[in-house]
Amino acid sequence: MSTQTHPLSGQELDVQQVINDIVDTKRLDILRAVNDLSLPTRRNEIADRAGTSRKTAKKHLSEFQDRGIIKTYRENIEPTAGGKVLLEAVDKCLQAIPIPRDEFAELTRTKIALTILSNLHREYQNAEEIQRKASISSTKQTVKHHLKWFDESDYNLADERGHTYRITDAGEEALIAYKELLVAAEQIIEKAEWLQRLPLENATVPVEKLADATVVASDTASPSDVLGAALRLCDLRVSRFRCICSIYNPVLFFAYKTMLDFGVEAEGILDWQSYIKADQNTFDFATHAKYEHYQPLYLEDSHTLGVGLYDDRRVAVGAYNEQGEGKHIAMIVSENPEIIEWAEGIYDSYREMANCPEENPPETSGSFDGRHW
């Protein structure tokens, strides 16, 4: 069973216990209310929708806040990308398992039940064999109690014949659904710093595919960590580079100019404020197409997302807090094909909104908001 240190709260979390805490309490109803209500919403509205007391809602919302599942601004509460994908992962599991929520809650309440079920096979085994393979310290009586529950429940997770037991189709389906939820929950915890900042409209990431992704996050003690990681990603060996940029940084821009000097085909989508700042510097390549193999584009709004696509083999996706002038940034770097495909989908959606400065020259007389790394 997986135990992880939460990067935001610093708590040591047993992931199986986290799953049970959600499905076995009002946490799930509160999480659903946060996601379903019109945004932003307030604590009392969430408590009413979840059918629970204000006190219980306050307690669970505080925990969600600490773990990056929701964000609050004054009295307003919204889910983060982490809160959205967590609810989706739990719902997917509950829809896939052949048992209702309360039975699933009982199954996940202790490690013993899950361990016993996962050590059943298609061949019949007696309780002693199951206990030995499961390597659990529980008594034979406890093992038999769980086996009897698996067999006698209305949902038939196991089949009994002559005091021997085997797993059923329903039991296998329950295990598969649980293991998928376990993987998703592990990644939601591990990538919490990034999911906390990822724009809600981009919370379509296949979280179970994030296992290979590394996370780099900046904070007050290490404000330049993400910038350093982005600089290290500058790769002269790629043949094509595409990016979305929402924070102006002349050092980063100059470093990536080297890729253009080496003939890398590139396209850059700058959000409005980044475009204005870069355009003020006539020596900055970012807004001026001084290379035949580079096309700058601009967006008419400000955004909080950055994407770098290095051919089709690596992607970096960074996001920052709406408050804090971009000083608190988290970025993932992944080579997983499904994460790359997801990021390409985001890039394409931004590209559809973008303008070509040669075809549609922007009005750049507006003021700059000072956001930078």
What role is predicted for each listed range?
Residues 232-285:
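Primarily the HKD phosphodiesterase
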Residues 51-65, 136-152:
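Short amphipathic alpha-helical interaction segments
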Residues 75-93, 159-182:
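Basic, amphipathic "hinge/linker" alpha-helix immediately C-terminal to the N-terminal HTH DNA-binding motif
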Residues 25, 37-42, 120-126:
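Short capping segments at the starts of secondary-structure elements
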Residues 65-75, 151-161:
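A short, conserved structural fragment
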Residues 3-28, 89-116, 145:
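Short alpha-helical segments that sit at the start of domains
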Residues 309-310, 314-373:
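Amphipathic alpha-helical interface segments
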Residues 92-121, 180-242:
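Amphipathic alpha-helical dimerization/coiled-coil segments
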